[in-house]
């Protein structure tokens, strides 16, 4: 026989099992709510009631509104069609009671025929459509050959200037007087090369004269020193005529010897009556000292 304690235990056991089952199973309350929401949406779509969608015009900002074009009065001369706005052309057609339907060019032609009949001749060169415009441009390209230019060159005309506009010269400068001296400004390297070339070209004229002819006999007058670039008295002995061999200037020495010239010539031109390939005694002495210092 069952005791009272056994009955209590048996009665509490199913309660605990039910609580364990409830805790182990997830809650289905939100799922049911979602399911009911889906069913409501389906029922609305089934009944044919669609949710209202906002129009894009309602969401436009005030800055996106179309700007109105100011309409000027109708001019006496109608400008070309490409310079007229479509809204302006439509307003002019309404004022003249002309139909503005169709393309812009058609409305332009109707307005010309009604209000500007004298300008109808200008429409001969206007193409009726874009296709006609392409055909006209292709026809022009075929006329002009690839090597020719379509532009026309107009010769310049010599317009005589009136005498009143020509300013009179009062005491004009003496531009045509003979000048005894000339000043030439050239870079140092170019000037040195030019002076060497000038000396070498003039040295060929005096090849028949011996190199020490001027040093053996006293020369009266003045002589031009290549290094100094000035005329010096030629009464003293020691003047030497330079020699050129293999593109180098040589200073003749005793016993048929020659020393290379290390001094740079001046960048000035001598007068036409003086030689420009002579070296003064001081420069000869300086050149000897320079060669000895280089050798030592």
Curated annotation (Swiss-Prot):
Pfam families: DCR. It comes from the Eukaryota. Keywords: Developmental protein, Nucleus, Transcription, Transcription regulation. It is found in: Nucleus. Residues 1-13, 42-58 have a biased composition (Basic and acidic residues). Disruption phenotype: The mortality of mutant animals is increased at birth and most die within 3 days. The few surviving neonates show growth retardation, but they catch up with wild-type mice by 20 weeks of age. Expressed in pluripotent embryonic cells, but not in differentiated somatic tissues. Interacts with DPPA2. Interacts with PCGF1. PANTHER family: DCR DOMAIN-CONTAINING PROTEIN, DEVELOPMENTAL PLURIPOTENCY-ASSOCIATED PROTEIN 4. This is Developmental pluripotency-associated protein 4. It comes from Mus musculus (Mouse). The gene is Dppa4.
């Amino acid at each position: 026989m069952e005791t009272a304690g056994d009955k209590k235990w048996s009665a509490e056991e199913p309660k605990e099992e039910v609580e364990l089952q409830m805790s182990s199973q997830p809650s289905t309350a939100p799922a049911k709510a979602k399911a009911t929401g889906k069913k409501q949406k389906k029922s609305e779509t089934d009944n044919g009631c669609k949710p209202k969608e906002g129009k894009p015009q309602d969401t436009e900002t005030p800055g996106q509104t179309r700007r109105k074009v100011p309409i000027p009065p109708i001019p006496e001369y109608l400008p070309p069609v490409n310079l007229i706005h479509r809204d302006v052309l439509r307003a002019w057609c309404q004022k003249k009671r002309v139909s503005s339907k169709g393309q812009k060019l058609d409305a332009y032609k109707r307005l010309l025929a009604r209000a500007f009949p004298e300008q109808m001749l200008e429409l001969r060169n206007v193409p009726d459509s874009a296709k006609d415009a392409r055909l006209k441009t292709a026809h022009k390209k075929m006329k002009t050959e690839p090597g020719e230019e379509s532009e026309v060159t107009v010769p310049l005309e010599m317009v005589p200037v009136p005498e009143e506009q020509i300013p009179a010269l009062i005491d004009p400068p003496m531009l045509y007087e003979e000048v005894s001296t000339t000043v030439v400004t050239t870079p140092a390297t170019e000037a040195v090369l030019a002076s060497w070339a000038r000396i070498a070209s003039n040295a060929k004229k005096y090849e028949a004269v011996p190199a020490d002819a001027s040093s053996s006999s006293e020369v009266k007058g003045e002589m031009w020193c290549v290094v100094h670039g000035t005329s010096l008295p030629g009464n003293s002995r020691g003047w030497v005529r330079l020699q050129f061999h293999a593109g180098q200037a040589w200073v003749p020495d005793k016993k048929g010897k020659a020393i290379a010239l290390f001094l740079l010539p001046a960048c000035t031109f001598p007068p036409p009556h003086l030689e420009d390939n002579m070296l003064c005694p001081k420069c000869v002495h300086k050149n000897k000292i320079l060669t000895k210092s280089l050798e030592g």
